[in-house]
Curated annotation (Swiss-Prot):
GO terms for molecular function: 4 iron, 4 sulfur cluster binding; carbon-nitrogen lyase activity; magnesium ion binding; S-adenosyl-L-methionine binding. Substrate binds at residues 14-16, 29, 77. It catalyses: 6-carboxy-5,6,7,8-tetrahydropterin + H(+) = 7-carboxy-7-deazaguanine + NH4(+). This is 7-carboxy-7-deazaguanine synthase. PANTHER family: 7-CARBOXY-7-DEAZAGUANINE SYNTHASE. Its cofactor is [4Fe-4S] cluster; S-adenosyl-L-methionine; Mg(2+). The gene is queE.
Length: 225
């Protein structure tokens, strides 16, 4: 029996945020999120019941088509995608996209980190929230940390998450944890959309803390999905 997942939307566009911004990408937005960020720009994705399901085979076929049309990466987002078990989806995507190329399509995950990792993921963007702290496993495994900034407390939280990520990697290196990443995560601060205070705080902080980089929702500025 095929695995089904609630789908808000899937589309071929450009990655607008983080280290991979500007890349051609196929997005799969899964329904369901219990994190409940007040500033969320995809609140329509929170409920699972309002979204139709699709099989992992259907999604993978669409991913393979997007790959043949130039999509360089596949991004699983939400909602909170780790509310779902992603093992079947990731495996099926790899099977379908390997037919188009010598290498399977890289799978990227955008998550708050409140649930444990499932599925074989090539790149993890951790966007932790002050009111819903991430699992230690995500702090160890993430490739980049992106914190949305609205007020000063968010900057303190961003530093706390960065420091905790480094600490967890040092611990897991000693214990040979298979999910740890030896290298430090890329660090991004992203001003809250339409937040003048967040924008100013972000700019001034990065000017004096060069380990952090600016992430903008460039897809919104361009008016694309």
């Amino acid at each position: 029996m095929s695995t089904c997942l609630p789908i808000v939307e899937r589309f071929h566009s450009l990655q607008g945020e983080g280290l991979h911004f500007g890349k051609s990408a196929f997005f799969i937005r899964l329904g369901g999120c219990k994190v409940g960020c007040p500033w969320c720009d995809t609140k329509e994705s929170w409920s699972i019941a309002t979204h139709q399901e699709a099989t992992v085979e259907e999604l993978s076929k669409e991913a393979a088509i997007a790959q043949s049309q130039g999509a360089a990466i596949l991004v699983i987002t939400g909602g909170e995608p780790l509310h779902h078990n992603l093992n079947a989806l990731c495996k099926t995507i790899q099977d379908f996209t390997s037919h188009n190329s010598r290498e399977t399509m890289p799978i990227h995950l955008e998550t708050s980190g409140v649930d444990e990792i499932t599925g074989l993921i090539n790149w993890i963007t951790l966007s932790p929230k002050r009111h819903a702290l991430p699992k230690k496993s995500l702090l160890r495994a993430c490739d980049e940390i992106k914190v949305v900034i609205h007020q000063k407390e968010d900057l303190l939280f961003a530093e706390e998450m960065a420091n905790q990520s480094i600490k967890e990697r040092q611990i897991s290196k000693k214990t040979s944890d298979e999910n740890h990443k030896i290298s430090q995560p890329h660090l991004f601060l992203q001003p809250g959309w339409n937040s003048k205070e967040g924008t100013q705080l972000t700019i001034e902080y990065i000017k004096s803390h060069p380990q952090w980089r600016l992430s903008l929702q460039t897809h919104k500025w361009l008016g694309v999905l």
